């Protein structure tokens, strides 16, 4: 792994586990996300400072998208304690047999719609609260990556006997229905 990748992963882990970021992240709810990204308000959060720095140098659109997803992710988990997040990362590391923060960063990066970040946060919340196992968390992360955001809204229809041409195939291939 290159040094820049290590710094990105390490800064993500520090940002995730650091309770001091809560005050900065609280501004997300009060201000428009795009204004925060452009203004550099959250550069004090290590991962966000790194991503914003890379974006300023490269003007890479993907980096801006990752920054936006990262803000939403950290904000969505800001009410959890450092200990809860440490325990989660440890369990996630063991389950993946790879550094948990690196795998989680890859999951966030692969998510194609920023609205799916709240779904990821809810899954992590369910895992931390003991409502799902770490194995199910890993599996459901794969579903988030594969399923188009628009089809998440259709899932509730499938709680009863329901079928919709086109949607059935996507949900089935994503492993959500059978």
Located regions from the model:
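Short, flexible coil/linker elements and helix-boundary hinge sites characteristic
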Residues: 5-7, 19, 130
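Membrane-inserting effector segments that mediate pore formation, membrane fusion
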Residues: 9-69
């Amino acid at each position: 792994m290159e040094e820049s990748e290590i710094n990105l992963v390490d800064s993500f882990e520090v940002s995730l586990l650091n309770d001091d970021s809560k005050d900065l992240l609280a501004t997300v709810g009060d201000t428009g996300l795009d204004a925060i990204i452009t203004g550099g308000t959250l550069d004090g959060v290590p991962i966000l400072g790194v991503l914003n720095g890379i974006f300023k140098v490269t003007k890479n659109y993907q980096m801006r998208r990752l920054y936006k997803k990262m803000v939403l992710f950290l904000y969505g988990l800001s009410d959890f304690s450092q200990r809860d997040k440490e325990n989660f990362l440890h369990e996630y590391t063991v389950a993946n047999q790879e550094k948990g923060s690196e795998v989680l960063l890859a999951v966030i990066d692969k998510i194609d719609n920023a609205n799916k970040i709240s779904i990821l946060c809810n899954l992590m919340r369910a895992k931390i609260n003991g409502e799902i196992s770490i194995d199910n968390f890993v599996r459901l992360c794969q579903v988030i990556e594969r399923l188009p955001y628009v089809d998440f809204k259709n899932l509730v229809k499938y709680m009863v006997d329901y079928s919709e041409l086109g949607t059935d195939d996507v949900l089935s291939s994503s492993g959500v229905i059978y």
